[in-house]
A protein has these predicted regions:
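Short, surface-exposed secondary-structure edge patches
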Residues: 33, 53, 74-76
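Glycine- and acidic-residue-biased ligand/ion/polar-headgroup-sensing regions
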Residues: 49-68
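Short beta-strand His + acidic residue motifs that chelate non-heme Fe in jelly-roll/DSBH
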Residues: 43-45, 63-65, 86, 91-97, ...
Length: 125
């Protein structure tokens, strides 16, 4: 069996809150680095299919989520080394308290699987 090695540059996608560096997005998994500017946030949103996990590599973040059983909103501070798993259907939002980076691993990503609950800095203007 021949082993194929693929070396490539990540795809950088500018966002209102910073940028996404797509490491890989294939039928099995997706890996990204989310680079945030201080004070910026992405939309409160959820995915029906995607299951994702974040690792805070740099900076600190205000993490907001909604309990879908009670409709209660919650928030917590995330610091370097914290890990959060977002299961499908869980509304969530990140806001950068300072410049920061989050490594995200997930199942395959499709833009059509993002459902916005509240606007973020990428939807303003």
């Amino acid at each position: 069996m021949k082993t194929e090695v693929l070396i490539h540059q990540g795809c950088i996608i500018p966002k209102g809150w910073g940028e996404e560096i797509i490491i890989e997005n294939n039928e099995l998994y997706c890996g990204k680095v989310l680079v945030f500017k201080k004070g910026c946030k992405f939309s409160m949103h959820y995915h029906m299919i995607k299951d994702e996990c974040w690792y805070v590599e740099e900076g600190s973040f205000l993490y907001r989520w909604i309990d879908t059983e009670t409709a209660d909103a919650h928030e917590s501070i995330l610091d370097i080394g914290d890990i959060v798993r977002q299961r499908p259907g869980q509304p969530h939002q990140l806001e950068a308290i300072e410049d920061g980076r989050i490594f995200e691993v997930s199942t395959h990503h499709e833009d059509s699987d993002s459902y916005r609950v509240q606007k973020g800095d990428g939807q303003n203007g």
